[in-house]
Amino acid sequence: ADWRRREPGRHARSAFRAAAAAGTLTLIAGFWLLTPGAERLRDFKPSEFKFLSQIQSFPDTRVVATSTDIRGRVDRVESPHLRFAPGLSLKHTEPLPPTTVVLTDGDRPVFLYDRHSAAEVLFARDTLSYAGYELVDRPGSVLILLSGGGLAVPCAIASGADRIRILHANPQVADLIRTHYGLPVTAGNPRSYLTQS
């Protein structure tokens, strides 16, 4: 019966040692992942079915910037072959402006349209997305809840709105949009933003 009696606190000490060993191993693995030797493990090659893999098959397409955080990998891709204008009228005959695409984890494209002149975004007036702006003469302010696509931004610019604010959930993508368009962009959850404003 003596073997059943255990030393008080022995179980707690064993659990503490096990937790300390696991924590130490986790820290060592984490630091190792930051070394140049582990770069192959950190960099992933996207699946052939991802948008990033598909557009990289176009000539003169290049990934110009890549960043990674807890929300995923964000790539900015430039190509002379990228065009995005869903719902474009068949009557539109002018060439579309060049675009840059921002991809999260190789998918979820957000297209950023060239904006060297106001005329370059006027193509948006010939899209179905612009129909709402036809109902209002010139909107005072526009809030764009942007999760993908990106056509909403040139539509708002083409409408001549006085104030345009863009909201995107991913801070990395929000920074790229802000830098590209020079418009106010907020990173965050749309519901939280709307309840606070």
Predicted regions and their residues:
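Conserved SAM/SAH-binding loop
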Residues: 187-197
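Membrane-interfacial entry segments at the cytosolic side of transmembrane helices
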Residues: 7-24
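Membrane-embedded alpha-helical segments of integral membrane proteins
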Residues: 1-6
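Class I S-adenosylmethionine
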Residues: 24-161, 167-188
